[in-house]
């Protein structure tokens, strides 16, 4: 069986007058993430991990922030397209293990809906997606509530293996 591991990371600044999207869902908060797309750091980290595992470069290569077509795009579209690229290359998802680092808002209540949403977009089982939330104990840019970051590790395998 041919299996591969990928790692992804993303970070965006928190700013006023933007919606907060994480894991494909809108979360009520006074600040949102700044970015060319909807700035969903969790989805972006997952996309990077998937592309890296398949040795297909990164999210910026496939969906450049210099392209107008991706301005304010829903990151679920990027994830769906990443899964299409992965499957076209002959891979399927084994599992995802992801962590989101944010001081606020508290994310644990939102994790079940994030998992459900991501599983639907990716056409995988919810049990194949693990999402954890943490803080940085008020340290660094995350602790000062200046931004949110996400880390994702994925396992992929050749289809039919």
Swiss-Prot record:
According to its UniProt record, the EC number is 4.6.1.12
Q: One Pfam family from the UniProt entry?
A: YgbB
The identity of this protein, by name, is 2-C-methyl-D-erythritol 2,4-cyclodiphosphate synthase
**Where, in this chain's numbering, is a divalent metal cation bound?**
10, 12, 44
Site note Transition state stabilizer applies to 36, 135
Among its keywords, does the record have Membrane?
A: no
Q: What does this protein do?
A: Involved in the biosynthesis of isopentenyl diphosphate (IPP) and dimethylallyl diphosphate (DMAPP), two major building blocks of isoprenoid compounds. Catalyzes the conversion of 4-diphosphocytidyl-2-C-methyl-D-erythritol 2-phosphate (CDP-ME2P) to 2-C-methyl-D-erythritol 2,4-cyclodiphosphate (ME-CPP) with a corresponding release of cytidine 5-monophosphate (CMP).
Top-level taxon: Bacteria
**Which cofactors, by name?**
a divalent metal cation
Entries under NCBIfam families matching the protein = ispF
| MF (Gene Ontology) | 2-C-methyl-D-erythritol 2,4-cyclodiphosphate synthase activity; metal ion binding
| Record family assignment | Belongs to the IspF family.
CC cofactor note: Binds 1 divalent metal cation per subunit.
Catalyses which reaction(s)? 4-CDP-2-C-methyl-D-erythritol 2-phosphate = 2-C-methyl-D-erythritol 2,4-cyclic diphosphate + CMP
Native organism is: Parabacteroides distasonis (strain ATCC 8503 / DSM 20701 / CIP 104284 / JCM 5825 / NCTC 11152)
Please verify whether the record's keywords include Isomerase: no
Q: In which pathway does it act?
A: Isoprenoid biosynthesis; isopentenyl diphosphate biosynthesis via DXP pathway; isopentenyl diphosphate from 1-deoxy-D-xylulose 5-phosphate: step 4/6
The protein's UniProt keywords, in alphabetical order, are:
Isoprene biosynthesis, Lyase, Metal-binding
Which residues make up the binding site for 4-CDP-2-C-methyl-D-erythritol 2-phosphate?
10-12, 36-37, 58-60, 134-137, 141, 144
The main enzyme category here is lyase
